[in-house]
């Protein structure tokens, strides 16, 4: 059964919300705060919900996380804040993400950047996704002049482009972006900053530069040599769904991969009408990097998962018609804790298929990726500064693709480092 | 072991000690019959009105006090029964015929001013109808009390004696006096009632209260056409007050007591019995859950008695009383120290906040989020053991 995944915000749910909020023990130095990458004062906002000051709850959330609503929808809370809830030891943890969604959906709130005395220093933020926006808002608060460059015509990056509607409804995203105080930041939409622009102009005009451009190049597959139709990479697939280019699927859809994006693709395929949606992953369930709750929901909705298979051939005339997998076995790896996989000779599986989606992860794009190049090794993991340069990084571009909340945390951290760098330089 | 829940109370035999108090659950004959079918040992009819023009009810008249969505008390502004005495007399006669093994008391009297003939007349007619006893409502804290009845009678020993004298002179059935909590020198009032011939005392009634205020419209609850009145608070919130009153009465007057106030379950009932009640009366819990709670009240009490080796309720009535002393008689040599069971602790830190901000700054949290108790600083107050959300985690131990 496919669930809409839309949040709790109705009066019917109010009773549940108040009861859930009343379970919170209001721990001293609560461990849940430590589990949240942006350290939202969780017990405080839950207590404000409990006493029906929903606006106060939302303020508490938004002060720490300008995308508090979006993160309420997208955070793998079971692996972050909720993991550390002390109530897990005597029963079930508080449903923190649901309460956060509720507060953000329910209350009206408009942020206003309280700006420190102006420094007349200029910072360029490249990328208008969670990391870039987060960094820009913080920097403005510190009193710096901020220019933000975004290659698309809209903000929010991956959240707007790829994350499916069933996980983050468009109106929630719009509302959250609408609540931001963006007037104090100069935002340049539709400007793609390539290596040339960065090195020749931006680096000369600005005192510091934050690079939070995300990952834009899908990891390639060499299986579609014949250029068969109906074979996509995950970005293409999700983006085409979001912009309406794909609005219906028929037959069998097979997604290759084991991350959150792969799970999104598989769940989306069912929603678009695929008769079967199969997720094929080369390792076992234990090694699968996707959030456990997401995988569970996918299975509940009817997504089928093939564990320990790796594709080696696509067949078809013009369109893809079949896919062949080899079975894999897992072998311990001396270097990393994660098990490696090997193909099992002779163990083959051929499946008819109508749509194939490769969700193998993404890389930095060639331009800014090459700009960073070997300098990646010089990034200070605490300050996110690239060597001793005026460049700072964060978000997926830096960490290779983590959660939205971690990108926001990166943006905040980089902003603090940039402030320190500018003021001490 | 054979356990019996039967109770002899002021000469009346009860099959179990659980009665419905004079309140909404005893609002009609039909209701009381259903309650007896469910197993209630007795019922006290909703206070009779001498003139039902005086018991015209307002709407709404019941409000509740909540905490986190759970009811901890009701507060009501309901008056005596709006049914005429004639109807009740017929109903009471029928109930006693159909349910001779269940105890039925009438409750007197909702009226304005104290008129001897009204009390005598009503008492006699009830006795003729066949009720097992009378309860004199000297305790209603709202409405009636504002017009000279209810709790205003119990505020004056002379009035207690006078009205009780009228009724005792008129009937032979047992007469129980229902006393309120908020009255000056309750033991003295109880003794006065006994001296004037009361066969039993019931306590307590609701506490005069203001249920709450609508903070957006500035109108207290319950709201009757945008106005309100002081109301009678009942339910779990008032149980500690009821226990205190029953204990005080039991310690001062040798008289059967029917305990009332916030009894929800068998443990509450046992507590009332341990401080001197030999029957108990219940209303609010029935208002919330219905007559069917008699099942868990009865089996819980039975199993408690089996476990404790009590054959009869009287075996344990009043057993807590010798343990209640004047404060200045309590030991000052008995010194305690808070201790933590680290295996049970979940690391919430509430004890450190409580001790830090309302105690003696004796509890700090360790790196691993476990309380570290400073034995020098701990003053044995016990607050930490009360606010700890985990069973048997923080306890007090004797200092050696």
Predicted regions span which residues?
Chain B
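N-terminal capping/small domains of soluble enzymes
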Residues: 1-104, 109-116, 121
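C-terminal helical cap(s) of enzyme catalytic domains, especially alpha/beta-barrels
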Residues: 53-70, 212-231, 273, 285-310
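Extended, intrinsically disordered, low-complexity segments
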Residues: 66-71, 239, 247, 299-348, ...
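Extended, hydrophobic interaction surfaces within ordered domains
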Residues: 246-252, 266-324
